């Protein structure tokens, strides 16, 4: 992985003339550096959502996989869709892990950042699931005042 990153950086530097300023890069070098960045397929939003819903809907998911999945999901530069959070909350319920369910809601609020309209929308969309599963929001528990 590191070697691939170094190759991309070296190819990009060579294309800009930083490694060998005396000679101009050939058109083939420029094409090569562009192609290095475009390998693999790009996942659509629907495919991304379906992948995570499927991950959290696994009937044999354990607590470690739940935490690993949420940690990975939180690492992305996005607020998860309500259907992904719904699947994660249902996984928490299957595992009887109330603390993780509340933590997921806290993380969603944190990921929304300064966009104050996102978290209320997510809670509104999740309200039927929260009521069905008996999960309280951090605000209902008073955790937002701590």
UniProtKB/Swiss-Prot annotation:
It is found in: Mitochondrion inner membrane. The modification N6-acetyllysine is found at residues 83, 109. Keywords: Acetylation, Heme, Iron, Membrane, Metal-binding, Mitochondrion, Mitochondrion inner membrane, Phosphoprotein, Transit peptide, Ubl conjugation. In response to mitochondrial stress, the precursor protein is ubiquitinated by the SIFI complex in the cytoplasm before mitochondrial import, leading to its degradation. Within the SIFI complex, UBR4 initiates ubiquitin chain that are further elongated or branched by KCMF1. Residues 1-37 form a transit peptide. A motif (SIFI-degron) lies at residues 2-16. SUPFAM superfamilies: Cytochrome c oxidase subunit E. One of its GO terms (biological process) is mitochondrial electron transport, cytochrome c to oxygen. Pathway: Energy metabolism; oxidative phosphorylation. The modification Phosphothreonine is found at residue 137. The keyword Membrane applies. One of its GO terms (cellular component) is myelin sheath. It is a peripheral membrane protein. It holds the Pfam family COX5A. One of its GO terms (molecular function) is cytochrome-c oxidase activity. Component of the cytochrome c oxidase, the last enzyme in the mitochondrial electron transport chain which drives oxidative phosphorylation. The respiratory chain contains 3 multisubunit complexes succinate dehydrogenase (complex II, CII), ubiquinol-cytochrome c oxidoreductase (cytochrome b-c1 complex, complex III, CIII) and cytochrome c oxidase (complex IV, CIV), that cooperate to transfer electrons derived from NADH and succinate to molecular oxygen, creating an electrochemical gradient over the inner membrane that drives transmembrane transport and the ATP synthase. Component of the cytochrome c oxidase (complex IV, CIV), a multisubunit enzyme composed of 14 subunits. The complex is composed of a catalytic core of 3 subunits MT-CO1, MT-CO2 and MT-CO3, encoded in the mitochondrial DNA, and 11 supernumerary subunits COX4I, COX5A, COX5B, COX6A, COX6B, COX6C, COX7A, COX7B, COX7C, COX8 and NDUFA4, which are encoded in the nuclear genome. Belongs to the cytochrome c oxidase subunit 5A family. PANTHER family: CYTOCHROME C OXIDASE POLYPEPTIDE (PTHR14200), CYTOCHROME C OXIDASE SUBUNIT 5A, MITOCHONDRIAL (PTHR14200:SF16). This is Cytochrome c oxidase subunit 5A, mitochondrial. It comes from Mus musculus (Mouse). The lineage of its organism: Eukaryota, Metazoa, Chordata, Craniata, Vertebrata.
């Amino acid at each position: 992985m590191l070697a691939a990153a170094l190759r991309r950086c070296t190819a990009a530097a060579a294309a800009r003339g930083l490694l060998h300023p005396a000679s101009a890069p050939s058109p083939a070098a420029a094409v090569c550096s562009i192609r290095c960045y475009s390998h693999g397929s790009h996942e659509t939003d629907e495919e991304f959502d379906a992948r995570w819903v499927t991950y959290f809907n696994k009937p044999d998911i354990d607590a470690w996989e739940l935490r690993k999945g949420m940690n990975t999901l939180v690492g992305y530069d996005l607020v998860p869709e309500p259907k992904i959070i719904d699947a994660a909350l249902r996984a928490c319920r299957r595992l009887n892990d109330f603390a993780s369910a509340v933590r997921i809601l806290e993380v969603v609020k944190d990921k929304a950042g300064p966009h104050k309209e996102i978290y209320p929308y997510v809670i509104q969309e999740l309200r039927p699931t929260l009521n069905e599963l008996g999960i309280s929001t951090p605000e209902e528990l008073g955790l937002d005042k701590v």
